[in-house]
Amino acid sequence: DFLLMGSANYPQADAQALANKLISIAELRKDVVAFISPNRGAFLNDSAVGTGTLNSAADMTSNVVGFYAPLTSSSYAVFDSGYKYMFDRFSDTFRYIPLNGDIAGTCARNDINNFPWFSPAGTARGGILNAVKLAYTPNQTQRDVLYSNRINPVIFSPGAGIILFGDKTGFGKASAFDRINVRRLFIFIEEAISAA
């Protein structure tokens, strides 16, 4: 049910091409949702020794919006706002990784604990696990910019931790299908009808 973009450690144009390819696969199949994160360069300036410095929050906002702007409008895609910092036990180091797997994980956890037609966002169901911090924590103004551009902000909320704070699909028009839970409900119904 999920297509993950994975790491987006490519130049922006290559990462956008990969994202559009995943969206086209999801649109063709109509039984999956593609989860997409921006390219790493939107947040980090990597040095030759493998360490990176973070861009400013204003730059990150414009970089993230710029990354998603040319992507195909689709209710079968979910766009998130960034990267989390976590411990990689296999390499015994901390690193930034994209959140697309975590956003898909909130949907999977929601399927187990609730139903696909419940929103995977918010403090009750949108918790991002195993994260030390975020590369980018948008403030209210930045969240408004992101959300109006089809991008689901992931934020740190005192008392709640790191949470998915939006439930939009990548659909570019106001519609019932611009919500993750509505798209997933219709996928669930179509599968149930075809199995009957």
Question: Model segments located where?
Answer:
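A glycine- and small-residue-enriched flexible loop/hinge signal that marks low-structured segments
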Residues: 1-196
